[in-house]
Amino acid sequence: MGKKCQLTGKKANNAFAVSHSHRRTHKLQEANLQWKRVWWPQEKRWVKLRLSTKAIKTLEKKGLAAFAREAGINLNQV
């Protein structure tokens, strides 16, 4: 599984690290991804997802079923 949020699709960003002398070197800004076990009440089971921290906050607000429906994800295959 790649370094990508399963619900939002958030992934790493290419960027520059800029030194004091303004030398620019490439760096990768990784998304803040966490493994999270989420209770799925419709199926009465836990689902383990790799989520960004922003997705975790949104998940608490919207709920798992609604968020997965918006993202177009089938939770039975997770």
Curated annotation (Swiss-Prot):
Example GO molecular function: structural constituent of ribosome
Gene3D superfamilies listed in its UniProt record: Ribosomal protein L28/L24 (2.30.170.40)
Domain of life the protein comes from: Bacteria
UniProt keyword annotation of Ribosomal protein present: yes
Keywords: Ribonucleoprotein, Ribosomal protein
GO biological process, one term: translation
Listed InterPro entries: Ribosomal_bL28, Ribosomal_bL28/bL31-like_sf, Ribosomal_bL28_bact-type, Ribosomal_bL28_sf
Record's keyword annotation contains Calcium: no
Record field: transmembrane: none
Pfam families assigned to the protein according to its UniProt record, in alphabetical order: Ribosomal_L28
Gene Ontology cellular component terms for the protein in this record: ribonucleoprotein complex; ribosome
PANTHER family noted in UniProt: 39S RIBOSOMAL PROTEIN L28, MITOCHONDRIAL (PTHR13528), LARGE RIBOSOMAL SUBUNIT PROTEIN BL28M (PTHR13528:SF2)
HAMAP family: Ribosomal_bL28 (MF_00373)
Family according to the record: Belongs to the bacterial ribosomal protein bL28 family.
Name of the molecule in the record: Large ribosomal subunit protein bL28
Organism encoding this protein: Acaryochloris marina (strain MBIC 11017)
